[in-house]
Regions:
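Conserved ABC ATPase "signature" region
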Residues: 9-26
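Conserved ABC ATPase signature
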Residues: 31-35, 39
Length: 173
């Protein structure tokens, strides 16, 4: 997809994108071994965006970043998503980050969908015990553990299905 850009356009685009995520243009000449983990993560995301994809898949791409860098990158991705009509599949254990960038959320546990919302405005209504654990990041209480174990046993037996709670919100029962 880079064929449509001249070398000069690629260079200026690269520098512009680096600045947008808090890196200077001098990073264009550095080798990966000269970069920190967070710098590498940002550059990998920018590299994927250089090709102007229609869909971007980010799998735990913000893990290990400090909160300021994470916020800067989320702001950039949110802006790019709107400006370029980019679809982002954002895989993360940070439900807060997903909330910030998502139009809808699908929560999975052990490879199965346990809850999903089509509209981020329904975020506060997420209610599955596993989702609650993700949202609050707190130690699990005895009652929450019992609820979770109940769902886990049903899951193991294959006795689960997604039920529509209200339009745009489905939960495993």
């Amino acid at each position: 997809n880079f064929v449509k850009f001249s070398k000069g356009e690629i260079w200026s685009k690269r520098v512009e994108m680096l600045k947008a995520v808090g890196l200077s243009g001098e990073y264009t000449g550095l080798y990966p071994r000269q970069l920190s983990g967070g710098e590498l993560q940002r550059i990998c995301i920018l590299r994927a965006l250089m090709a102007e994809p229609e869909i971007l898949i980010l799998d735990e791409s913000l893990s290990g970043l400090d909160i300021f860098t994470e916020n800067k990158l989320l702001n950039y991705l949110s802006d790019i998503k709107v400006k370029k009509h980019l679809s982002i599949i954002f895989i993360s254990h940070s439900i807060e980050s997903a909330y910030y960038i998502a139009d809808g959320i699908t929560v999975m546990d052990k490879g199965r969908i346990i809850e999903e919302i089509d509209d981020i405005s329904l975020f506060s209504e997420l209610c599955h015990p596993f989702t609650s654990r993700l949202m609050h990041g707190l130690p699990i209480s005895a009652s929450a553990t019992q609820d979770y174990n109940f769902y886990l046993e049903r899951f193991k037996k294959g006795d689960t299905r997604l039920v529509t709670v209200k339009p745009g919100h489905r939960i495993e029962l």
